[in-house]
Amino acid sequence: MWGCGARALLGVWEVRLAGFLGRRLLGSNAAAGKSIAPQCWNCGHAREAGCGDEFFCSHCRALQPPDPTRDYFSLMNCNRSFRVDVTKLQHRYQQLQRLVHPDFFSQKSQTEKHFSDKHSTLVNDAYKTLQAPLTRGLYLLKLQGIEIPEGTDYKADSQFLVEIMEINERLADAQSEAAMEEIEATVRAKQKEFTDNINSAFEQGDFEKAKELLTKMRYFSNIEEKIKLSKTPL
């Protein structure tokens, strides 16, 4: 009788021990899976996510290095969308430059000067990229793993290429300001049409269509650059 009771008691302890070890194992796995907060390079204080201060240590106020995982849309406080409020984008750009521009770090350590240069370059690149519809669209595609190498005629049909050639010929032959303005108006209207259609393609998640339209838009952007150069006095 005693032997049966001992075996029963031993079984209870085994169940309890297994449960205890299981909880310990789950706890250690959760701790291992939890990401470790980055530390300030200057004071070693943990930089907590979501603390509201993206660029400076909340403890010692030292400028921190740029976050390599952050995309341009996040940096500039924009939704990851082809449709961007350019006025808000400009305000964000000015705000960031007041925070990280190298002129404000001339008396700081070499490390902070270096980080300031990195931040300022990143902010400039983000602003220029998101400001223009073409570069914004190409960047959105890049975030999807899709790139259009320069000089690619992706789905540019012969009729479209003839249209581009004719506009370039008109531009080369333009002898008056009125002729130049007519070409410029044509190009501006085409770019507006492309912008609207590209926005629709991204909203529908049709990245192939967006890629096709952005390829064509790049041709007209090149013509726009030629028009600007023709207006620049020598």
UniProtKB/Swiss-Prot annotation:
Disruption phenotype: Knockout of the gene is embryonic lethal. Specific loss of the gene in erythroblasts is also lethal due to anemia. A divalent metal cation binds at C40, C43, C57, C60. One of its GO terms (cellular component) is mitochondrion. It holds the Pfam family HSCB_C. SUPFAM superfamilies: Chaperone J-domain, HSC20 (HSCB), C-terminal oligomerisation domain. One of its GO terms (biological process) is protein complex oligomerization. It comes from the Eukaryota. Keywords: Chaperone, Cytoplasm, Metal-binding, Mitochondrion. This is Iron-sulfur cluster co-chaperone protein HscB.
